[in-house]
């Protein structure tokens, strides 16, 4: 579906819906709405999970899964059958989220901003955790065959790193610092969704210490 500029400016245009919900969560728009299954998602929505969990599926079949105490704002979303004309821009302020790209596939037109990093995505499955201080932890996940699902460029004001191997990770403490050198984690998918940056994997802690 191609959304015209006029449609995009109209707040009532549906760009996706809540595909999973568990516990308490809200969608902030003109007012606060309780999150429920199949609830329409619109551009500029502010999704907050509180003590619950939510999954959002967009028109291109991309999915964002939010764990407890997460906050996500949908800045911009344009879907076109031609992936090169599509665009997604999100702000992820806190919590843990898993991002799975859909028909956007390998086009580098998906971007996510955290308080400390800018993340450019090319056809991938990854998680991002932002703690209460704004520190960001980004982990690239494998595809169903156990190989790299794509590529992520994590950037700050001082530089950038590329993640392109399964379970590679980087952290960013402040936007004025470089991201840490990528490390490969010894971790399973079962642990990913519940990961908190306040207790990062040992490999990440070691890499942070080496860069200080």
Regions found by a protein language model. Name each.
Residues 1-11, 33-36, 50, 59, ...:
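C-terminal interaction modules
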Residues 9-30:
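Short N-terminal segments immediately surrounding and downstream of signal-peptide cleavage
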Residues 20-22, 49, 121:
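Short, conserved beta-strand element in jelly-roll/cupin
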Residues 23-24, 52-54, 71, 124-126:
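Generic short beta-strand segments
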Residues 29, 36-37, 67, 76, ...:
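Short linear motifs in exposed loops
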Residues 29-43, 48-53:
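N-terminal post-signal-peptidase region of extra-cytosolic proteins
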Residues 30-32, 73-78, 121-128, 132:
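Conserved short histidine dyad/triad with adjacent acidic residue
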Residues 47-57, 64-115, 119, 143-152:
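Short, small-residue-rich packing micro-motifs
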């Amino acid at each position: 579906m191609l959304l015209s500029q006029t449609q995009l400016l109209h707040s009532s245009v549906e760009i996706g819906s809540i595909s999973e919900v568990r516990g308490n969560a809200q969608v902030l728009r003109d007012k606060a709405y309780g999150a429920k299954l199949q609830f329409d998602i619109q551009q500029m929505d502010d999704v907050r999970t509180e003590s619950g969990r939510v999954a959002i599926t967009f028109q291109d079949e991309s999915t964002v899964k939010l764990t407890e105490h997460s906050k996500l704002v949908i800045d911009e979303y344009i879907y076109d059958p031609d992936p090169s004309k599509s665009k997604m821009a999100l702000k992820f302020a806190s919590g843990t989220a898993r991002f799975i790209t859909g028909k956007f596939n390998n086009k580098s037109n998906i971007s996510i901003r955290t308080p400390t990093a800018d993340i450019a995505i090319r056809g991938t499955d990854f998680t991002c955790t932002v703690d209460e201080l704004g520190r960001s932890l980004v982990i690239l996940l494998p595809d169903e065959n156990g190989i790299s699902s794509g590529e992520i460029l994590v950037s700050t004001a001082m530089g950038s790193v590329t993640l392109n191997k399964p379970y590679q990770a980087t952290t960013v403490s402040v936007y004025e610092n470089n991201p840490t050198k990528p490390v490969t984690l010894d971790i399973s998918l079962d642990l990913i969704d519940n990961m908190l940056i306040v207790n990062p994997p040992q490999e990440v802690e070691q890499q942070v210490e080496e860069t200080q």
